[in-house]
Amino acid sequence: MRIAAVPFPVAAGVRLHGEVIAWTCSGVAVRHPDLVAALRDAGLDEGVARELAPKHAFARACKKLGEQRIIRRVAEDGASMKFQFTAEHRSDDRFEYTLETLLTLDKRSGLVSCDLPGLATAAQERLDCALGVRTASDVTRVIGKLFDRHADLFPIRPQGGCYFVPERHAGFNDRVQAMLGRIGGRILRFPFPAGTAEGTGA
């Protein structure tokens, strides 16, 4: 991970109020075990990277399965969910819709079944991928949970993305930085000197 230069040098011994930080993990796609390992190696709480439930993973899988078809949930109970797959075709100046199949998802095992073997295989592959991979949005939520549980994070702007962290949490920032570096992300850290009567001392 490349550490960006701070906007100004801070002399040794200068007291800091804290740091302004921002992070990016755009494009990151990391296997769940690798994310857990990165958290563990950085001395962070592994519990923030929970397993993804099959029902939530299937919602992600549907985004890739939904090309030229409409997928709708039609039934759900404690053990399973049932989805209707409807193919969409354009004919001249109108769209036509044809029922493809009803697909069942076992909410406990994560197994899917339907009467179209090819579609069942594709759906299972997409689901397994979604279960095993964490996206940039997932990593951002993990970082948010870490700070919620272990450090103070004050937003600089209403929409988030840039935060002030008090100096007492500098060591925690170090660990988050190490974790992000392991999975291809970056954190930018800008020191906020406490200053003196003569100026910042920076």
Spans of features found by a protein language model:
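Charge-rich interaction surfaces and accessory domains that mediate macromolecular binding and assembly
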Residues: 2-106
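Terminal interaction module
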Residues: 2-11, 21, 30-49, 57-62, ...
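Internal, hydrophobic cores of structured domains that mediate oligomerization or house catalytic pockets
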Residues: 95-173
